[in-house]
Every structure is written in structure tokens, then in C-alpha cells.
Amino acid sequence: MNARFKIALVSIIILQIVSLVVFVIYQENLKDTGTKIVLQTIPIDPRDLLRGEYVDLRYEISDVTVENMSCYRLCLGYDLGDSSNRSRSRKDFLSSAQGENIYILLTKEPYRLSTQAISSGSSWYVYDISESNSFDNRPEEIESLVIKGRIEEIEEIFTEIDYQIRITVDYGIEQYFLEEGKGLLIENADDVKVEVTIASNGKAFITDLIVDGTYLNQSVSD
């Protein structure tokens, strides 16, 4: 191994370490400067709840129901008047939308798209959705924030008098690492909420679990 190769190898290793450190600092800065909120979880099959040392989580804001045909253009970027879209069926479009990023405008009061069942324990509601984190209709009189997600599943729902699109959103906060022995606390809990930090770019981070009114991390440290 000649000296030039050694220098190149060391340089690559150092660059990777520096990149990792910068990424960690960036992520921590997002958490430190973000906004903390509490999200209500919804029950899932207990057999799927725990996976090793991780708990699977699902939220009241995970399923978004959008009504009327305008949602193709306003919510999903599908312009029915665009000639390039006319040859694409709605089914093809819906299929291609899976995996795409989506931004959810949450408010402290239910309105607009808040057609999904919301329990009394919830404090944040889906107000609108968009392809970008810019919302022209953001209400000034209601506390609001934007959270970024990814379309996990999307389906059409037809009834005799209505038409809807149901979107399942993955926010990247659907799994949480548990210390050994803490799984039973979650399995036996009557109510589980999640403290989440929302960064300025919409990315969400779990900071704690609230199990039957008790913060899990705080109780451990105490």
C-alpha cells in the first residue's frame, strides 16, 4: 500500500466521519428549534404492536379522507384539464401517487378535511394537504403547523351519494425504540399519546411517549 493510497483512504474515512457528525448536528438542531406537539395514537392489532424492541404506532392523523373531485388537482397535483393527464386513468394516477411526499397542515381546531373520527383526547386536526409546505389558505386565527409525510396508501371510496379519496400517511414516526421491559406498559395502556417535535421543514421526531398520562422517558429518568 503506497503513501498516496493511504492518504486517499484516510481522507475518505475522515470525510465520512465529518459528514456523519454534520448530519447528526443538523438533525439535533432541527429537534432543538422545532415545535413540540402531542399526537393521539389509535389502537392497532396487539399482535402487531411490538416488534422486538420497537413499538408500532398509528395516529388519528394517519388516515386523511378527502372529499370531491377537486382533490386530484388541489391535493395531489392531478390537473384534470391537463391534456397529458387525459390518457391516464384515475387508477393509474392514484397508484403513481403512492410513495410521494405530502404536506399536512394541522390546526388546533377541526375544519375542512377533518372528516375522520377524532377522539376527545386529540388536540391537532388535519386542515388541508398539499404537495409543498406552502399553504395559501393557512388560517391566521387558528394555531397551525405543517408536518411532512409520505403517501403510504391511497384509495377511492364510492358511495351512492358521495365520493372520497382516503390517504394513509406515513410521517416517519410510526416506530419507537423501547427499553427492555417497557413493552408491557404499552400493551396494557388505556391511552397512548406521543410527544413529537416538528422541525421548520416539516420533519417530525418522536421525543417521548405519554402512557396513561405519564411521560415514559421522564418516568425512567426519575
Protein language model regions, located:
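Helix-rich terminal scaffold detector
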Residues: 2-35, 39, 43-222
